[in-house]
Regions:
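HIT superfamily nucleotide-processing domains
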Residues: 1-109
């Protein structure tokens, strides 16, 4: 766990890519069911994570995703992507295209 407050929690996804998941504190199944304060905090945290990754890692692109098919709890994935990552330009859930050659600064929680 990286961060938690009464509206959200932020977790690091175990992956070679810089990747965080931001969950609502309450187990809402759909974004439209979230209370306004939780939804606002979720988006605020998403933007903070995106800006921090852009500044720290200098990625080619930031991917932002929300599915919830396997984990039916509102959450957003924020993932820094690089031209030389194993999946680029495809989704991180696709098959790998190459061996990754990432050399990234170390991130400590």
């Amino acid at each position: 766990m990286i961060y938690e407050d009464k509206f959200i929690r932020v977790e690091r996804e175990e992956n070679e890519l810089p990747w965080v998941k931001i969950f609502t504190a309450k187990p809402y199944r759909e974004l439209s069911k979230c209370d306004e304060a939780s939804r606002a905090r979720l988006y605020e945290a998403m933007l903070v994570a995106e800006k921090a990754m852009l500044e720290f890692y200098k990625p080619t692109k930031i991917n932002i995703a929300s599915f919830g098919n396997y984990v039916p709890h509102v959450h957003i994935h924020v993932i820094a992507r690089f031209e030389n990552d194993a999946f680029f330009p495809d989704s991180v859930w696709a098959s790998t295209k190459r061996k990754s050659e990432l050399r990234l600064p170390k991130f400590d929680e």
